[in-house]
Amino acid sequence: MGKTLFDKLWNRHVIYGKEGEPQLLYVDLHLIHEVTSPQAFEGLRMENRPLRRPDKTFATMDHNVPTEDIFNIQDLVAKKQIEALQTNCEEFGVTLADMGSDRQGIVHMVGPETGLTQPGKVIVCGDSHTATHGAFGAIGFGIGSSEVEHVFATQTIWQQKPKSMGIEINGKLPKGVYAKDIILHLIATYGVAFGTGYAVEYYGETIRNMSMEERMTICNMAIEGGAKMGMMAPDETTFEYVRGREYAPADMEKAIRDWKTLQTDPDAEYDLHIEMDASILEPYVTWGTNPEMGVPFSKAFPEIKDMNYERAYEYMGLKPGQTAEEIELGYVFIGSCTNARLSDLEEAARIVKGNKVKNNIRALVVPGSRQVRNAAESIGLDKIFIEAGFEWREPGCSMCLGMNPDQVPDGVHCASTSNRNFEGRQGKGARTHLVSPAMAAAAAINGHFIDIRKEAIISGGN
């Protein structure tokens, strides 16, 4: 019987262990940031251990960094963590994309941009959205601080092999529907736990026709459906994305010959298989307090089916039967490791251009990396957003999570391109609605959610 992409990647990296039991995997790339690494570095010091492979470790700061006045950090905990990362990287010989560096940004954007993220690798990071890197035909998953220390010391990690799930996605995406809507649809349909215990491979016509940036959006949110990791087979789109980047292989053609073997065999079988027709999708909006609580734009919010729904409606200040258009928005956030790449900003700017943010909205655009910010400014996207009334910020995780100065006020509804709508995720009492960048941009200039498939209702003015 043939092997899946996941089987091939896993088998390449097993150092020790029997099938069915935890196995020791070799780690090709360890990405770190300021929040989950300090304890791990301190553990090395206490045991007087070296960091085994600093050349396979790369650091940046993203979670705590301010996105304005970036060198004047007011939060003492954030300042201490950032300074600790600088000190630790210098002491242990780790390459650091420091504050203000041309390579600094959200860790899951910096890896691909620099060419560190490549097909065939096992990539770990002390962050739950490490599945993003699976879009390149890699195994990527998040780890805890104790595991970060283990990788520091050994360049390996113990893991129980998950089962395999194949999600076949075919059909052309309708106008106004994006990669973000695909993953929101999957989670809304099957739930936040449907991927628990699985490594998910996304494939099919729709995936093949996507850019790398779109593919990363889908893999980024694999964890929100419960999966340990999400991945896609590498192809010419992947190879051309990696080619010419700072850390791309010296012998690119040799690497590509190997990467081309990273495909699921025709006779391979997944433990679970799901089919999806992308051509019938609508823009999605979440109404509740986890990504499963989402609806197509044309549908009303569902009836209360259990205590979780009851609590979600109470927290969000909404009721069954309402529609997304009725939500009283106060904030719009375009950013995060899900949707802060150049193509995301270009699509948002296309809608925003020539319009104005409504008076009831405070709108932020936070590029996910310095590279994206520089590229956006080189083609004038910053001017489009600023002229429309958006705040144009420095790179970082920003309003995706309440660990930095960018937070949504208590009780305020925010249209967000991020990946989690948990209670308090964007700040105490914040009410988060997950959408695509286009939906968020249109909401900013209309003052509420609209059906972006109908361009006639995208209008400016205050």
From Swiss-Prot:
Keywords: 4Fe-4S, Amino-acid biosynthesis, Branched-chain amino acid biosynthesis, Iron, Iron-sulfur, Leucine biosynthesis, Lyase, Metal-binding. One of its GO terms (biological process) is L-leucine biosynthetic process. Pfam families: Aconitase (PF00330). It comes from the Bacteria. Its cofactor is [4Fe-4S] cluster. GO terms for molecular function: 3-isopropylmalate dehydratase activity; 4 iron, 4 sulfur cluster binding; metal ion binding. Its EC number is 4.2.1.33. It catalyses: (2R,3S)-3-isopropylmalate = (2S)-2-isopropylmalate. Binds 1 [4Fe-4S] cluster per subunit. SUPFAM superfamilies: Aconitase iron-sulfur domain. Pathway: Amino-acid biosynthesis; L-leucine biosynthesis; L-leucine from 3-methyl-2-oxobutanoate: step 2/4. HAMAP family: LeuC_type1 (MF_01026). Catalyzes the isomerization between 2-isopropylmalate and 3-isopropylmalate, via the formation of 2-isopropylmaleate. Heterodimer of LeuC and LeuD. Belongs to the aconitase/IPM isomerase family. LeuC type 1 subfamily. This is 3-isopropylmalate dehydratase large subunit.
